[in-house]
Amino acid sequence: MYAAPLVRGETLRKYPEIGTALDKLTGKISDEIMAELNYLVDEKKQPPSQVAREFLQKLGFKTSTQRSGAADIIVGSKNFTEQYLLAEMLVVIIENYTNLDVDLKTGLAGTQIAFNALLKGDIDLYPEYTGTGLLTIIQVDEETRDEIIQSKDQVFNYVKEESKKRYDVDWLTSFGFNNTYGLMMRREDTTKFNISSISNLKEYLDNLSNLNDI
């Protein structure tokens, strides 16, 4: 699934230049690049602000402006490395390609807290994932989920439309990398229960549930 900036509709109407500026990040971050940036922070212990700014510099973006006035908008993030990096990039791009002053509010503990902060206006935008948007924010029904889940673009379009309709928030264009959920299982258990895919796991759990019902 895609990662993209999620912005309050009210904020975007007031400052449409935000959308124009952040469109510059469209497709700029591949899976490999995102993994490398996370590595620099988690393993090399480099500050997310430094890693984000140096990455944007390498791409040729302007990064020298660092405003210190009263904030026009507030960028938020959840409380893990990838979010810190993306939020720092949003700040750099907005401050260097608009005349807006930006504050940063990081470490929001989870999707519901971050999204509620967005709705209340405590923050104006934050990085979010379309898979999370589909399942946690929109809470899509099972039939619709099964119809669109195999297509990243269909998920993006559905989440974008429903988010605007229900909450007046806008999904901007994707950063580029694919963010999906995965499951880890001990090798001996995969062999023991003949599980090599999520479908196998679902079948195993369904059978287990049926046995418990007997």
Regions found by a protein language model. Give the residues of each.
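Extracytoplasmic/secreted envelope proteins and their assembly/folding machinery
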Residues: G19, T26, S49-L56, Y84-V91, ...
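Short, well-ordered beta-strand elements
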Residues: S68-Q83, L100-G107, N210-I214
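Periplasmic-binding protein-like
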Residues: K14-A52, R166
